[in-house]
């Protein structure tokens, strides 16, 4: 896999798009368990935070240190999301091509990911979102 190197703040949009793809794929399944719904909510919140970063950075000049810190965090977010998306994407495409996909999609995803993996992903996503909020606070003060 080619490493993701953010060359501009437009790359933030790529991270938001992956988060949205995962969110959309999970949201489209019905009858999800509590943990599953929490992950969906966390992805939505993360996507909103990344979108906020994009808007703030377009309007706020940054020094090189802040720019590098934000780029490093965006790179880490991108890696996390790509790995998770890579685990579920192939199943989403196959399952969504038929009419019975909604309940099967959830079952297959949980069978593949297991509750611990989803909880671990949620925790990492929450940490990245917290880091993003810290960066936002720092550049807007």
Predicted segments with their positions:
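Alpha-helical bundle protein-protein interaction modules that mediate dimerization/oligomerization
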Residues: 115-118, 124, 128, 132-136
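Elongated alpha-helical scaffolds
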Residues: 72-89, 117-120, 124
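N-terminal amphipathic alpha-helical segments
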Residues: 1-73, 84-95, 99-102, 106, ...
């Amino acid at each position: 896999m080619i490493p993701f190197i953010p060359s501009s703040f437009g790359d933030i949009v790529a991270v938001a798009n992956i988060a949205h793809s995962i969110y959309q794929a999970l949201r489209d399944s019905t009858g999800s368990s509590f943990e599953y719904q929490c992950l969906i909510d966390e992805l939505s919140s993360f996507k909103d935070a990344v979108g906020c970063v994009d808007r703030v950075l377009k309007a706020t000049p940054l020094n090189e240190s802040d720019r590098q810190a934000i780029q490093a965090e965006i790179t880490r977010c991108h890696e996390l999301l790509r790995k998770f998306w890579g685990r579920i994407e192939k199943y989403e495409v196959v399952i969504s091509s038929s009419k019975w996909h909604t309940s099967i999609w959830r079952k297959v995803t949980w069978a593949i990911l297991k509750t611990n993996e989803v909880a671990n992903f949620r925790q990492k996503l929450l940490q990245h979102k917290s880091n993003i909020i810290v960066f936002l606070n720092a550049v807007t003060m």
